[in-house]
Amino acid sequence: MKPTSPSHAALTRRAFLGRSAGGLGAVALASLLKPDLLAAGGLPGFPNFAPRAKRIIFLFMAGGPSHVDLFDPKPKLIELDGKKIPPELLKNHQQFALIRGTPSLKGSPYKFQHHGQSGTIISELLPHLSKVADELTVIRSMHTDTNVHDPAVNFMNCGTLLGDRPTLGAWLSYGLGSENSDLPAYIVLTSGSSDGQPLLQSFWGNGFLDSRHAGVPFRNSGAPVLHLDNPPGVTTADRRRELDMIQWMNRRQSDVLGDPEIASRIASYELAFRMQASVPALAEIKDEPEHILKLCGADPAKPSFARNCLLARRLIERGVRFVQLYDRGWDSHTNIDMEHKRQCAAADQPAAALLADLKQRGLLEDTLVIWGGEFGRTPVAQVSGKTWGRDHHPHAFTMWLAGGGMKPGLTYGATDEFGYHTVENPVHVHDLHATILHQMGINHERLTFRTQGRDFRLTDVQGNVVKEILA
């Protein structure tokens, strides 16, 4: 094989890139890309119209919080507690993930009250969110297509049950680009119970889009991103020689193959180089004023949902387009009383503080905050010995949104008297996605990518903007 043949060039360059990545960690190839290629806008003509929101923080309660215990009180469940579920509720649909037989109805043991001028009804498990009730747009009529965790999380993120499609954050990065060349457009933070539902890389993947649009996970302790520091023994002169060589090889390889994934790899190196300067200071939340730390309940030294909420605000202040916080531990099949109390105690105050903090900084107006999981939980009990929980429930659940041009203080949609089915203004996940994109200035039918002979989009061939919840 001649050294100048295309296949030999590809192998040679890929091997060199692999050795460089291993030897230099994620040291960037700063000379290969112009800075504006990373901070540039997205597709021509996007946004399609003036956006109400410029950025999104998605507080994802992984596992599925119980709507009938948090936002959707059902006196009928309390009245009929212990009675078998009416058979007519179970007709013509997928029923339960794990429950077998005919289960009994289970009323919520928690008290609900009206809060704020809006009178939004919230459970006693969420006393801090109750104080910001007038900021919330509560959707009680969400529904999705599956009661299985991984496909349901994929569906909430990708608009499909499959794990090989772009996520919401990736679509936004693709359509709108990045506002900051020093940070990724899409960042993922995780917290919660270590024995919670596993988090898959597909939940923040790029699918068939360019790999630079994938979410970048930040660690919740220590260095947020590994391998940003130069390894011992690598001098500036050493790095300069390697970068010069890769630049030369990049030009040759582009001439021969024009492989777009090579450009993505180089862009990642460029971004990593810039992150060496931007990330360390960004992650130092101990620099936050004491009253802000107290407001969020955050200990700078401990990984937590509270710490991630603070970090999310710092990220969007610096132009990150989409920040997604996964909080694990909401999958309460047994001992739901203990588990939901634990999860609410960890997530309630930080979520409320995030809204208050964004508002007092003037950021809530154009930042869309989303709270919810992949589905809800059953109005019937899943009994295990002396404890009980609730199974997965895709037919009806609650999510809330705040800021970003939403109508504050509104409770939208309704479920039946058992909280089992949606009966008023149902909102499918595709509708939610269409609405989110609309607030970001995007017509969801125009944000497409052509592959495999057809145009794909986040909302597939469905989805309607829920205009009634918009301010």
Model-derived features: positions:
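Ligand-binding pockets and gating/stacking loops
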Residues: 1-471
